[in-house]
A protein has these predicted regions:
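Conserved, well-structured functional cores that handle cations and Mg-NTP chemistry
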Residues: 1-166
Length: 166
């Protein structure tokens, strides 16, 4: 909020901006954004899908705060779990090689109607499919699941998924 250079007190600016966050992004604004992204991309783009985490170890008043594997502290031999949220992101590279998001969702297994991380990933895949038609989906380890292969085959999409070594 310092970057806005407004004469108002910081707390008032935060309150004003927070009120609008509750409403979310309107469907027309989201659609206009995605149509602009489509203009910036190639005819058959590469869509990268990946999960991340947002860790809130000291949080206790956050809605639906779950337990996530902390990617910053975990190693291949040791997993560290903390309070936080999962983040699923899908992005493309524009014709000028800039990454641009086409899907972003913060989610938690503690949400009321939460089904699974795969459900969120399928939403990202469907978003890319509906926006571009034909694309190549690229995903890292963790997505090497028959459900992913079947979903992408069902939609007639090309894909590259790095497999786990085990």
């Amino acid at each position: 909020c310092d970057q806005l250079h407004e004469p108002s007190k910081k707390i008032n600016v935060v309150d004003r901006l927070s009120r609008h966050l509750e409403k979310g992004v309107s469907a027309s604004a989201a659609s206009a954004y995605l149509q602009q992204v489509k203009k910036w991309s190639s005819s058959e783009p590469i869509i990268y899908i990946d999960d991340s985490d947002v860790v809130k170890p000291d949080g206790y008043k956050f809605e639906s705060l779950g337990i996530v594997r902390d990617g910053s502290e975990s190693t291949s031999t040791k997993s560290v779990y903390k309070k936080g949220y999962h983040v699923t992101e899908a992005c493309i590279l524009t014709s000028a090689n800039h990454p641009v998001s086409i899907f972003s969702k913060i989610h938690s297994s503690h949400e009321k109607d939460y089904k699974s991380a795969n459900t969120i990933t399928f939403q990202a895949i469907e978003q890319g499919n509906s926006l571009f038609g034909k694309a190549t989906f690229v995903m890292d380890r963790g997505y090497d699941d028959n459900k992913m292969f079947l979903k992408l085959d069902e939609l007639g999409q090309d894909y590259v998924i790095r497999l786990k070594s085990n």
